[in-house]
Design a protein with these regions (language model features):
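Well-ordered alpha/beta subsegment
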Residues: 100-102
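C-terminal helix-coil-helix/basic helical segment that borders enzyme active sites and/or dimer interfaces
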Residues: 306-309
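Terminal amphipathic helices with adjacent charged low-complexity linkers/tails
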Residues: 115-137, 259-293
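Divalent metal-coordination and catalytic microenvironments
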Residues: 98, 294
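Conserved catalytic alpha/beta cores of large enzymes that bind or transform nucleotide phosphates
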Residues: 96, 222-277
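N-terminal accessory/capping or targeting/presequence segment of soluble
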Residues: 1-92, 105, 109-244, 299-300, ...
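Acidic, metal-coordinating catalytic cores used for nucleic-acid/nucleotide bond scission
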Residues: 104-106, 257-258
Length: 309
């Protein structure tokens, strides 16, 4: 099966004008635990971290020391297993054009991995999906956390973000990491098999308007709860139209989680300020209720472990 898929993938190289194709572990939301495990689809590798580059005459699978033996067992028949550190400024091949899905990489990743010795070509269609697109999709709605759990309302958190935007003399913040949207709005979801992260993105401006970029059916509860206005819920399919109808200005994007696709899209409308999303730091500072709940969780965990022993 893997050999057949590799052959099908390589058959597309000529059509797209590429010498190889890159497949990361993450999905469009940069999650390691996605329903769409394209790396497993093309390599049979089931570890939580890895990266494949398929060339016309060679297949490379990059993994860290945790997975060296596992990768050999699962993928060694079709792939050369390489230490993950060697992916930086990779010189295993040179002067090639590597195709990739711009939704799956940040511009920093591309510079770090490919551009010293090779060129990249952005391909709008994911080539793995063209040969295998039988992934399960979750359509369960997002839900809000109980006020007794979070300790801080989403309105207070939004005020902190507004202050950050103004301090950086900008007009918008684009929150591309779903876990940061979850923190800001105090919501969770069912999109990933082992994590309650809601797959969505968010834009917020200096006038306290928030625009949730999400599949409509997943966010209906948030409209009922008046966390999001109906007109401010943006289906990803309508994103181009939405951007055309809002004011220009300076927008802050996160260097860790904003994909090349979104960076290119936003650059057409805004002046970009590339900076770390402030929510990473904000959410690391726990409020009193969060600290109390963490202590209680450790107690419950200790009781469960003691009973097991």
């Amino acid at each position: 099966m893997i050999t057949k898929r590799l052959s099908q993938l390589k058959d597309k190289f000529y059509k797209f004008g590429i010498d190889g194709y890159a497949i990361p572990k993450n999905d469009e939301f940069f999650s390691e635990y996605s329903q769409k495990d394209r790396l497993k689809t093309i390599s049979n590798f089931t570890g939580s971290a890895g990266f494949a580059i398929i060339l016309k005459d060679q297949n490379y699978l990059f993994v860290d020391g945790r997975y060296t033996i596992q990768a050999e067992m699962e993928s060694g028949k079709n792939f050369k297993i390489i230490d993950y550190n060697k992916i930086i400024n990779c010189n295993l091949f040179k002067n090639l054009t590597i195709g990739l899905d711009p939704n799956l990489f940040t511009s920093d990743q591309i510079k770090r991995v490919f551009l010293k010795h090779n060129k990249i070509k952005e391909i709008g269609s994911n080539l793995i999906d063209l040969i295998h697109n039988k992934y399960q999709s979750q359509l369960k709605p997002f839900f809000s956390l109980n006020k007794d759990i979070v300790g801080e309302s989403h309105l207070i958190k939004i005020k902190k973000i507004i202050n950050f935007i103004k301090k950086n003399k900008s007009h918008y913040l684009f929150i591309s990491a779903p876990e940061n949207v979850a923190w800001l709005l105090n919501i969770r979801g069912h999109d990933n098999p082992n994590s309650p992260i809601p797959n969505c993105r968010l834009m917020i401006n200096d006038r306290k308007e928030i625009f949730l970029i999400s599949e409509i059916n997943k966010a209906k509860n948030l409209i009922k709860e008046k966390k999001i206005k109906k007109q401010n819920l943006i289906d990803p399919k309508n994103l181009y139209q939405f951007l055309n109808n809002i004011k220009k200005g300076k927008i802050i994007i996160d260097t860790q989680s904003c994909s090349l696709f979104y960076e290119n899209l936003l650059r057409k409308k805004f002046s970009l300020l590339r900076k770390q999303d402030p929510i990473y730091l904000m959410k690391s500072i726990k409020n009193k209720l969060e600290i109390k709940n963490m202590i209680n969780s450790h107690i419950s965990d200790g009781v469960a472990l003691t009973k097991f022993l």
